[in-house]
């Protein structure tokens, strides 16, 4: 499922506030421990979530609150500490779960995409995208 609101942020806002970023420094994908074990994914491992439309990299959080064979991704991620110039654009596409939905398929009443879930694959990766909290502090101020 996609679009879970993150309690420490307001949608995509406040990633540049050091104290909030310390509470939730990386984009997470929640996965049931049984599913994770079956796929060889361990808690805290970076994962590639993908389908025929695109991919996103998120960090695994094992939790029994998600049903087996279902994953739940946080939304709204971008990295204000990174380069904002095109094509990088603050890393907005690296961990954007909306990469996995088809573009330009909108609801009849507006321009919002009517997707709350999508078929996808998930695999562990050896890549490391952990947030450098020292960089956050240097760029945006002390952690308080």
Task: Name these PLM-found stretches.
Residues 1-16:
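Long, low-complexity segments enriched in small/aliphatic residues
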Residues 15-144:
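Long, contiguous, secondary-structure-rich segments that constitute the structural scaffold
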């Amino acid at each position: 499922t996609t679009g879970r609101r993150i309690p420490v942020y307001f949608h995509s806002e406040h990633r540049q506030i050091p104290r909030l970023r310390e509470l939730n420094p990386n984009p997470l994908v929640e996965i049931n421990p049984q599913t994770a074990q079956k796929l060889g994914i361990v808690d805290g491992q970076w994962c590639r979530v993908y389908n025929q439309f695109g991919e996103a990299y998120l960090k695994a959080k094992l939790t029994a609150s998600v049903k087996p064979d279902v994953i739940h991704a946080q939304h709204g991620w971008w990295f204000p500490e990174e380069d904002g110039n095109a094509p990088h654009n603050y890393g907005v596409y690296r961990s954007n779960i909306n990469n996995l939905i088809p573009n330009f398929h909108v609801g009849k009443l507006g321009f919002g995409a009517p997707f709350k879930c999508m078929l996808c694959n998930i695999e562990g990766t050896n890549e490391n995208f952990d947030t450098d909290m020292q960089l956050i502090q240097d760029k945006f101020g002390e952690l308080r």
